[in-house]
């Protein structure tokens, strides 16, 4: 216990000690280095950086091969940049939530700090983040953008070590890096400077958030620099589960070297964090798209999670069972080590190389919704399909609370939900090598080789339906009944109705190899680029075969009479596909402050271990998902206006639909379909007078499904009957047709500094749950605010809040129910936004 307490304290103590030493060093060296250009960024300088990120002079390095990057005015693609200060002003709840600053990006952050579903306008995702990649210093964090129970923002945390982010949509990303056809967020780290400098901040929030952040950059020797920083925090969460909802931190360090001909940066990061994975709560549906609170359940602050169901034993987990803990949530223990090297070889030759090694555990401990709730009596003695009732002989059952408290009232509302545990161990190594040659004035040819090898070791325990009260901080319930004089146990002593429906172990291994060529040609005001890529993915996945067994040999313990168990044999699937991608873009600079562009690209989305290999046989895996994208844009800036507008037409084919049951088991045949989308994205700002600015991020999407002439079979929740629906022409699931954010801000200067106040109004238009479009999720509007005070050169005070009006808005309903998810009583399980959250940060810059 003592060692555990020391380990919990080690990270915040380490950060505090490093920053204390850094502050002393900064004071000691200020006088001796006064003649050097100061590296310390005061609050005012940080504001200047933020302003520059919203101009066309901002240099971006993502999505192009230009030495040193390209100015935004020269890029023939859509890219959003944000400085460290702008990231904070966006007040993101998580890494994924930050993506909302990019028009057309739709992160569903209602699941908590991690595990977000990330949608991109016109890219038909529907869950996880198949068309989104996270990069650190230009290197993808994992070889595949998503797996079941994993998307790459889950292994990345925002803190004061992040210098800026570049968010690229479509365009040239199909050729460079991991060849992502959708969107890529590239996070760049702060590095050391000539003058020791840094910051330390503390944050307190109304959900009992306590957080410390810090960064320190320093010189080591001539042209050698180092930095270290990180964060530690704990929080009860807006939805208090009766244990720490978020707890952990990370530590990041860099070592960099500058020379006359190039630069080198090495970086390392250790992340150890655990976060509550928030699951749907009950609501009442009125009509097709209006919702209100379920009696006794606050949809903004309540959760089923509780101390009573926190610790469980899962006998069906592969290898003989395991203990699991809800407090571990969607946890991450991950290590990173990478480096960037850029060198001018002379005579027009330039070399660039990026590598990253990372690995660790990304486990999930969470409740997953299944059937709707009902009374204890109806659950026991009816066959109502919407609640998964037991249909026991009348008067035969005994239902009592697991942790004492006597018998359960027959009128008590109850529900059974899956207590799922997924252990996921990932490893990844990647390298992106580029060699460029200036062929003649204005023309540069780049050849690149991208290699990555990555593995996945999983153990799943899906199902584990636990009977519990349908109340905030639920209590588990155990049930037995008498049948012909024999006592039968419907649940075990923990309240489990079963020991899993899908208890698999799997090991995946893959290698991707890609060669690409890119030519960039500047002719006066024209900038033309043409790039091509050929990529091969060679992957295998071994999944244990399951046999249903009676774990204890007792036919009267119904919960374990048919437990899917790995039987020692494996299904091996191999996936070996090669596909070319290409992109062509043309940018024309109309004036120093204005440009237009057009771009076309075609790319492919390779299959992953879970969504292409598992459940399929070698040679019979789904086809590649292919996209063709056409876009055009206009960029303009002046003292009064800033505008970055793009229009697009995106077409998909090769999409697959695989139905699953309430326990997560794949059922039925896969179906193929496509999509067709047109839309407009806008990022802009108006500055009508000094110190006032109105910023806008907006998108309009007209997207629908295509190329499926069959119908999708599903079970109607109300009638229990099997029905069929066609999806051609239906709105892309979970993507709002219209979304916009308006942020007016006003800065008031004083002799001692300044105060900036802003509010953000967000409108999210109508959106749907799945391909059927039968379950509407409605629309909603939110208000956020912020007040930032910069005091002298060294202090910053920040007060910010989200969802200040406690708006009830849904991003997801019950993912295990296809079609309408509301029962005859209008009850629906869904994930609303969290309620009002306010936090205060005090930061010292040195």
Residue ranges and their predicted role:
Residues 4, 29, 653, 690-693, ...:
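C-terminal beta-signal and adjacent terminal beta-strands/loops
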Residues 48, 62-64, 68-71, 76, ...:
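Extracytoplasmic beta-strand/coil segments of soluble accessory domains associated
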